[in-house]
From Swiss-Prot:
<dbReference type="GO" id="GO:0006353">
    <property type="term" value="P:DNA-templated transcription termination"/>
</dbReference>
<dbReference type="GO" id="GO:0005829">
    <property type="term" value="C:cytosol"/>
</dbReference>
<keyword id="KW-0889">Transcription antitermination</keyword>
<keyword id="KW-0694">RNA-binding</keyword>
<dbReference type="InterPro" id="IPR011605">
    <property type="entry name" value="NusB_fam"/>
</dbReference>
<dbReference type="GO" id="GO:0003723">
    <property type="term" value="F:RNA binding"/>
</dbReference>
<comment type="similarity">
    <text>Belongs to the NusB family.</text>
</comment>
<dbReference type="Pfam" id="PF01029">
    <property type="entry name" value="NusB"/>
</dbReference>
<dbReference type="InterPro" id="IPR006027">
    <property type="entry name" value="NusB_RsmB_TIM44"/>
</dbReference>
<protein>
    <recommendedName>
        <fullName>Transcription antitermination protein NusB</fullName>
    </recommendedName>
</protein>
<dbReference type="GO" id="GO:0031564">
    <property type="term" value="P:transcription antitermination"/>
</dbReference>
<dbReference type="InterPro" id="IPR035926">
    <property type="entry name" value="NusB-like_sf"/>
</dbReference>
<keyword id="KW-0805">Transcription regulation</keyword>
<comment type="function">
    <text>Involved in transcription antitermination. Required for transcription of ribosomal RNA (rRNA) genes. Binds specifically to the boxA antiterminator sequence of the ribosomal RNA (rrn) operons.</text>
</comment>
<keyword id="KW-0804">Transcription</keyword>
């Protein structure tokens, strides 16, 4: 498994823990630093991804909801939602990562961690987000 895939999977675990436990982000990151053995570059990429998602969570969640026909965030499976948050962060705020790579990585992670409907659900919403004509959703700020 590649460094970035491993980092995205670690980031998913961090986001899920943050979403479920609702403690401070600092405590969540510290818990993973102390409790999960991984390479430094993997951990750094995962933490940067988590911090980016948390920093832009409101905009990311709004973008997901806008493309989720008849789905409120509260009804979405937590794993699927956090996979989409990671990919949406990359699609909206990271110009150095090709959009198709972000979507494909999210689908593969959904296959591994979600249920049998997860890959199609994640793909459908991310395809809508990727196809959005509003270029201002993809920021150069990071």
């Amino acid at each position: 498994m590649g460094l970035r895939r491993e980092a995205r999977e670690l980031a998913l675990q961090m986001l899920y823990a943050q979403d479920t436990l609702q403690g401070s982000l600092r405590d969540t990151l510290r818990g993973f630093r102390e409790g999960v053995e991984t390479g430094e570059r993997t951990r750094e990429f995962a933490e940067a991804l988590v911090q980016g998602v948390m920093e832009h969570r409101e905009a990311i969640d709004q973008a997901i909801v806008a493309r989720s026909k008849n789905w409120a965030l509260s009804r979405m499976p937590r794993v699927d939602l956090n996979i989409m948050r990671m990919a949406a962060y990359e699609l909206m705020f990271k110009r150095d990562i090709p959009k198709k790579v972000s979507i494909n990585e999210a689908i593969e992670i959904a296959k591994k961690y979600g249920d049998k409907e997860s890959p199609a659900f994640v793909n459908g919403i991310l395809d809508e987000l990727e196809a959005c004509p509003k270029d201002e959703e993809r920021s150069d700020t990071e």
